[in-house]
């Protein structure tokens, strides 16, 4: 989860008198060592002692490491090591990486199309992004990447891994995947320009299916536009499915805005930092964009962060039942702090659902557990017919079995979505 704070202004002092990272650290260490004899507390003295150790290690590495390394490389790696050791989502970003991140949240960038985290030294895939090389090649949420072009990923930071995976458009990269207990296998992906369409939609049997792939600057606006078009169109939309599967999250304020679209009142999420007194509560404003029509939310193990905020808020207010399987469980908030020569991505808080629960490392539990599966044997037993639904539409110019065939195909292709649509229809019938 990212707070949209990378637009902060750099202080006038920093603008007029930029200090290089190297000079600042040398000055800081020298100052601290000199302060050891000036009557500071034991805790402060211990801190200064550790900084002097850093200085010694830095110089030894410079003098004796097998390959020549620059001061900039060493300092950036030291900063990254410090932040990565805190949690997998904190990191130091060089100036170039900071610019890339700003492009990411705007909705277009180059790469493979996966959202990742680090776990036990390996790259863990939170989710593949729709219509990208990774998704088309069959990469799945929960996969681990152990090697990139034959090189182990152990020891890499997230940003270093991302940097390797990005590159010239069309240039292939081989990723080694571990999936469950199976043997590792290689997938060759060609890098592409990743243009994220954060909101997609389709209408299936008078149910609006709203697919949200990420929470970027375009999400709420796109969702509003689609819903207004559907509500004013010729089809009488009976209800909606909000599909958040394999949505890795994004911007906090967008997740709040999306939740607010479907709620009349009440808390959406609270954000709590280290200071227990410092609690930010975000609440809904009056106005349900679909005016109380049935809504069902779909989640899976690739639904993370902002997706979990939306699912948790709608679940706790009984606005929508949640279908699918338990979500990813990323309940932390990161902020981007611009500094000279880059930025710091730092975990500053955890978020809590309206019921007061943290989903960190636990996730959102669905109300109805529906694993994704290829339903083959069960198809023979299904007695579902389009004509069984109340107010089923007819069309004199088309095959009367067309919708029935569409639903049958949906059972095979996406059983979770089929169940969600069925649930919306049931809720719509109950409301009448």
Give short role names for the model-derived ranges.
Residues 1-21:
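N-terminal secretory signal peptides that target proteins for export/translocation
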Residues 26-35:
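Bacterial N-terminal signal peptides
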Residues 37-41, 356:
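Short linear recognition/processing motifs and adjacent strand/loop elements at protein termini
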Residues 40-50, 54-71, 124-128, 132-141, ...:
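Cleft-lining beta-strand/loop regions that shape enzyme active-site pockets
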Residues 43-58, 62-64, 70, 87-113, ...:
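Glycine-biased strand-turn-strand hairpin within the trypsin-fold
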Residues 65-126, 172-174, 178-188, 196-198, ...:
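Extended, small/polar residue-biased N-terminal targeting/export presequences
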Residues 340-349:
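Short acidic, Pro/Gly- and aromatic-enriched capping/linker segments at domain boundaries
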Residues 350, 355-432:
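Conserved functional hotspot residues or short segments at active or partner-binding sites
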